[in-house]
Amino acid sequence: MAGKEEIIAKAKNSITEFDEELAAEVAEEALAAGVDPVELIEKGFTAGMEEVGEQFGQGALFLPHVLAAAEAMKAGIEVITPEMEKRKSQTKNLGTVIIGTIEGDIHSIGKDIVASMLNIAGFKVVDLGRDVAIKTFVEKVKELKPQVVASSALMTTTMVNQIQIEEQLKEAGVRDQVKTMVGGAPVTQDWADKIGADIYGESANDAVAKVKAALKVG
């Protein structure tokens, strides 16, 4: 049986090679070998996804490559989700996070990864999906009273809608009851500061760490 480092390296390769079948196989192998699922995701699948993201940013890869890598990661995570859920039931809930891709944006790659990582970290995640209307974010905040509401935007044209979340939460009188987080390829710390968001998640790992810090948990 392969050692932990070898399994993690294979997990990373399955993403950079856009291989769904390999990702699922590696996940099975990792579970059988007793590899920590969180470590497998962080150092294997997510590391591979971040490498693909960097190459996409440099113009070496294109959107279909990123989507294929995301599908591979999804295949791997699906295999280890039951084990994660089993562990999660034995730990306390750190809080509720509502997450969705902003109105007008049909891409869900980054959002899906952040949602998975937050779930694994011990948060209850309510995933609203993609192309989510601003009013839906606001309605869900009022209904579910989460600790964090997060929006992802993968295009500069949809990024501006993140301002609307801030404004409509204020209009609804609930802005001070929830932390807001923004992320996505064109989003920056400067943008988060400009619109008044509480948290900027640069990557999935960064998002989890910052949510924990903001809520003083974990």
Curated annotation (Swiss-Prot):
Annotated protein name in UniProt: Trimethylamine corrinoid protein 2
Summary of the function given for this chain in its UniProt record: Acts probably as a methyl group carrier between MttB and either MtbA or MtaA.
Lineage: Archaea, Methanobacteriati, Methanobacteriota, Stenosarchaea group, Methanomicrobia
GO CC annotation: cytosol
Coiled coil regions in record: none
Residue stretches making up the B12-binding domain: 94-218
SMART domains listed in its UniProt record: B12-binding_2 (SM01018)
Pathway(s) this gene product operates in, as recorded in its UniProt entry: One-carbon metabolism; methanogenesis from trimethylamine
Chain ranges of the B12-binding N-terminal domain: 1-92
PROSITE patterns: B12_BINDING, B12_BINDING_NTER
GO terms, molecular function: cobalamin binding; cobalt ion binding; methionine synthase activity
Pfam families: B12-binding, B12-binding_2
Family: Belongs to the methylamine corrinoid protein family.
Binding-site positions, methylcob(III)alamin: 107
Organism: Methanosarcina mazei (strain ATCC BAA-159 / DSM 3647 / Goe1 / Go1 / JCM 11833 / OCM 88) (Methanosarcina frisia)
Gene: mttC2
Keywords, sorted A to Z: Cobalt, Metal-binding, Methanogenesis, Repeat
Highest rank taxon of the organism: Archaea
Any one biological process term the GO annotation gives: homocysteine metabolic process
This protein's record includes keyword Transmembrane helix: no
Subunit structure: Can form a complex with MttB.
